[in-house]
Amino acid sequence: MSNILKIFVDGLWKKNSSLVQLLGLCPVLAITVNAINAIGLGLATTLVLICSNATISLIKNNIQKDFRIPIYIIIISSVVSSIDLVIKAYAFNLYQSLGIFIPLIITNCIVCNRADLIAVHNSVLVSILDGLSIGLGSTLTMFLLGSIREIIGHGTLFFGIEHVLGESFRFLYIEVLDKNSVFLLFAFPSGAFMILGIVLAGKNFLDEVLGIIEHKNVCVCSNKVLVYKDGNKKIESQKSL
């Protein structure tokens, strides 16, 4: 398996930031009320990951280890602010829906994690591909949760798509369920927790069936991997790509 394919398989499935590492769950649970909001925040997060990873990789030789976290935050803040202004200018309705969750991308631990784990140790190309794969993995997770919650909680799919992609895409809007058949619980955060739990269980079941599950815990803070072999715990350093 080539390195590029491995990066995307890890980002989309094996090391999905939302379903495996369980990072950045606050926006995942809060903003996935419908599919369009989920796609909007997911793509914004993906752009932040790509741009911040590329920038940090370009200047990695000039970043002192003791000051790396403040530098990451400054770079990520600049990227998020730029994307926030673009969304406000060209997709104002989406901007109003996402609200505070766009600026909160700055504090999203997924972004800082990839910067410190990948971007500062690898080439620009690898850093960009890593940001793209991790971002798409998070976007797909949010889209799945948002679609399920919108269908069950509101009986629709792609509500408000014309505000993001234009009137020509209004035909994608679907009324799946009658308004009297919806289950409003899933439109609230408690429903988001329930759906996330079901999705996590489904992914773990598929991993077991396909035989691709890895019984190991990754410590994001120390970049260590705890590998369990024959009941014994062995600590190994995680290698960069």
Swiss-Prot record:
Catalytic class of the enzyme: translocase
Keyword Cytoplasm (UniProt): no
Membrane topology: Multi-pass membrane protein
Pfam families: Rnf-Nqr (PF02508)
Enzyme Commission number: 7.-.-.-
Keywords of this entry: Cell inner membrane, Cell membrane, Electron transport, Membrane, Translocase, Transmembrane, Transmembrane helix, Transport
InterPro entries: NqrDE/RnfAE (IPR003667), RnfE (IPR010968)
Entry GO CC: plasma membrane
GO BP term, example: electron transport chain
Signal peptide positions (record): none
NCBIfam families, sorted: PRK12405.1, rnfE
Biological function: Part of a membrane-bound complex that couples electron transfer with translocation of ions across the membrane.
Quaternary structure (record): The complex is composed of six subunits: RnfA, RnfB, RnfC, RnfD, RnfE and RnfG.
PANTHER family (UniProt xref): ELECTRON TRANSPORT COMPLEX PROTEIN RNFE (PTHR30586), ION-TRANSLOCATING OXIDOREDUCTASE COMPLEX SUBUNIT E (PTHR30586:SF0)
Protein name: Ion-translocating oxidoreductase complex subunit E
Gene source species: Buchnera aphidicola subsp. Baizongia pistaciae (strain Bp)
